[in-house]
Amino acid sequence: MAASFSGPSMIMEEEGRFEAEVAEVQAWWNSERFKLTRRPYTARDVVALRGNLKQSYASNELAKKLWRTLKTHQANGTASRTFGALDPVQVTMMAKHLDSIYVSGWQCSSTHTTTNEPGPDLADYPYDTVPNKVEHLFFAQQYHDRKQREARMSMSREERARTPYVDYLKPIIADGDTGFGGTTATVKLCKLFVERGAAGVHIEDQSSVTKKCGHMAGKVLVAISEHINRLVAARLQFDVMGVETLLVARTDAEAANLIQSNVDTRDHQFILGVTNPNLRGKSLATLLATGMANGKTGAELQATEDNWLAMAQLKTFPECVMDAIKNMNAGEDEKRRRMNEWMNHTSYDKCLSYEQGREIADRMGLKNLFWDWDLPRTREGFYRFKGSVMAAVVRGRAFAPHADIIWMETAKPDFAECTAFAEGVKSMHPEIMLAYNLSPSFNWDASGMTDEQMRDFIPRIARLGFCWQFITLGGFHADALVIDTFAKDYARRGMLAYVERIQREERKNGVDTLAHQKWSGANYYDRYLKTVQGGISSTAAMGKGVTEEQFKETWTRPGAMEMGSAGSEVVAKARM
């Protein structure tokens, strides 16, 4: 309970409690769980942000479980594989086969926003949308766990031994998009996720204003330092709440073509500039503004931009220098020597600033290179960016001390890219865990892989360190496929379509929704009714007359299309 601190002795008690809690937090940080984590703040800062009333969160137990699961996979060179869950039906079916659950912002944006207004993945839905979906699924997990316990404790030991146990409490990793704004927005979002049941949260390095699905065009990155601030804000909130929620840092740098600012020198080597001196003083933004003032619209403005970019000869500054060396009036040996000198000073992992690169170029005699990164800025003020795996590696290395897992969003399922990213990040952070999006946005059949290579893709990149792998929209696509094909067949064949495609398949595969009243917990709440009323209730939902009794016995239907040896088919079996 919170105490009142007024007199001198109470003041000392207040300080004593504070210092004890600071020591407790410091000991927690010194544990194996956080040995790789860097914090730019102190335990004292964290405790000062806490209230006097200590709270605990169920999601913290699942965060610890997720950590153990992923570290085990990492040690074994395997992966936790999962996909985006849409609803309680999916999350309970997944629990029987998978060891983690994903909640996708794309799926929420298209199917379950808090305003009920669907749309594409632009992160323009209310920021409690994904936390609310997490709570929806987390409540379902807990409910089915309670329901199973009641059912099992109503069985004999022999019955329990014959009955498979399902761990419904699989940890949830949720989509935190870009953190939904500034530091305070990220802090409040992460607080919601912990309260609603998330064991892990991922945050990406796109601009929150222009955020898009990772497989759309027009992605705008924020500076490395800005995204680190987001990660620090998330970690601080987790520390204040005393939880071990896993933090996943995602980078979209592999395919991004714009960046919000050039404030971070680590980004400089990937920013594009104009190398055509004929465009000196003729910025693209000014040209477009003039065109609009003169009445140009749409296609005309696009043509103006396309023509300007074609003339601009955009390059990064390192590319500009290397091209200048190649075009020097010197022998091949001298060019090779200059190129080696440049590369030795400016390899991408050194992350030299533009100013440092310009100084080195000047020393090499390349003093009059024309290169301007302001001229090609967009109408919105964004810089042009050359996305690549190298850019993602630089960001992954920078994010690793502040996150538990690093994820590079990619444009295609490319093993060589996965290898380059894993080796690049792990060369500096060998113990960091990696994640991979097995995206349905990829046309896997056009990837050039054989069926065997597709089957082996997950274990193959798992050996590189990608210990958490997921199909973001797996639930969405599975739902659409089943409903579309069933609706079409049902419109044509009526109840036979339902019986053949759904009911018999549920029975054949042991899907527990066959007995949907029991799946929904009717027996569980009958137990409540009977407990309240002394062990008997005339209004129990699963009492005499419930139609689900039809599924308890085994009988045969003569003349079935798929006949057994006796010319009949088993169409129902007793299920517990």
From Swiss-Prot:
Source organism, top-level taxon: Eukaryota
MF terms (GO), sorted A to Z: isocitrate lyase activity; metal ion binding
Localization annotation: Glyoxysome
E.C. number(s) listed in UniProt: 4.1.3.1
Binding site residues for Mg(2+): 175
Gene3D superfamilies cross-referenced by the UniProt entry: 1.10.10.850, Phosphoenolpyruvate-binding domains
Cross-referenced SUPFAM superfamilies: Phosphoenolpyruvate/pyruvate domain (SSF51621)
Catalysed reactions, as listed in the record: D-threo-isocitrate = glyoxylate + succinate
Pfam families: ICL
Cofactor(s) of this protein: Mg(2+)
Database matches in PROSITE patterns: ISOCITRATE_LYASE (PS00161)
UniProt keyword Lyase present: yes
GO biological process assignments: glyoxylate cycle; tricarboxylic acid cycle
Active site: 213 (proton acceptor)
Pathway this chain belongs to: Carbohydrate metabolism; glyoxylate cycle; (S)-malate from isocitrate: step 1/2
Keyword Magnesium applies: yes
Enzyme class, broadest EC rank: lyase
Main location: other
InterPro entries: ICL/PEPM (IPR039556), Isocitrate_lyase (IPR006254), Isocitrate_lyase_ph_CS (IPR018523), Pyrv/PenolPyrv_kinase-like_dom (IPR015813), Pyrv_kinase-like_dom_sf (IPR040442)
Cellular component terms per the entry's GO annotation: glyoxysome
Record-stated family: Belongs to the isocitrate lyase/PEP mutase superfamily. Isocitrate lyase family.
Assembly mode: Homotetramer.
NCBIfam families: isocit_lyase (TIGR01346)
Purpose: Involved in storage lipid mobilization during the growth of higher plant seedling.
Protein name per Swiss-Prot or TrEMBL: Isocitrate lyase
Organism of origin: Ricinus communis
Organism lineage: Eukaryota, Viridiplantae, Streptophyta, Embryophyta, Tracheophyta
